């Protein structure tokens, strides 16, 4: 019988005999790498959730230049009025009971409501009592932020009753003081848009402006 000598491949050769076939065992040869698809991460929306007068409100917020800003309102609750001002640093919220709150992007809430008005004779007029006594009375209406520290709103104060004239009042946010612009007296007042001169106001059909300092100009 003829002797048969078999060659055994070493690990370095990475080859072996299988039956009569010489097989290359280097897995890297002929293999195909499958690239994983790149999935772009969609930034998740972020919200600031607050409660005003037992009503939840969600503000959509964003980060810009390392600063948190209010971008929009997810949904304005029924009979609420919301004005986002001050370049998104805060929002002014008027609830159905005519309370005014400033909501800051940080989550802080500041109530700047005029809870009562004290007349020249010292008599005290309480907001909720007046509103219950005179249906449709305007204590606070359509507040608009005219600067970082001031808010303008429309009111019937300082008079009480029915069929009253309207006035523009200014809130100083820091001191929470309210002051009337007497020259704004009118049957109808409508706040329009902000521009270079300030807040555009239609007063009985006449165009005026409220400056960032709270002054009424032509």
Please describe what each predicted stretch is.
Residues 4-27, 171-218:
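Acidic, small-residue rich beta-repeat scaffolds with periodic aromatic anchors
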Residues 40, 49, 83-95, 101, ...:
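Short beta-strand elements that form the blades of beta-propeller/WD-repeat-like
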Residues 97-103, 156-157, 161-171, 206-217:
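Structural motif
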């Amino acid at each position: 019988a003829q002797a048969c000598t078999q060659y055994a491949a070493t690990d370095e050769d990475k080859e072996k005999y299988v039956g009569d076939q010489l097989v290359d065992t280097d897995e890297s040869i002929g293999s195909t790498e499958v690239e994983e698809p790149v999935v772009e991460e969609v930034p998740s929306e972020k919200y600031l959730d607050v409660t005003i007068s037992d009503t939840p409100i969600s503000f959509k917020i964003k980060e810009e230049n390392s600063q948190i800003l209010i971008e929009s309102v997810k949904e304005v609750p029924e009979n609420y009025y919301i004005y986002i001002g001050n370049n998104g640093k805060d929002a002014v919220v008027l609830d159905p009971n005519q309370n005014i709150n400033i909501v800051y992007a940080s989550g802080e809430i500041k109530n700047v409501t005029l809870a009562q008005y004290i007349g020249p004779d010292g008599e005290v007029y309480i907001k909720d009592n007046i509103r219950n006594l005179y249906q449709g009375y305007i204590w606070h209406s359509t507040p608009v932020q005219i600067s970082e520290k001031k808010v303008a709103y429309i009111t019937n104060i300082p008079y009480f009753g029915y069929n009253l004239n309207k006035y523009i009042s200014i809130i100083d946010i820091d001191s929470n003081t309210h002051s009337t612009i007497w020259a704004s007296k009118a049957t109808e007042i409508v706040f329009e848009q902000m521009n270079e001169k300030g807040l555009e106001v239609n007063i009985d059909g006449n165009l005026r402006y409220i400056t960032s300092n709270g002054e009424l100009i032509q």
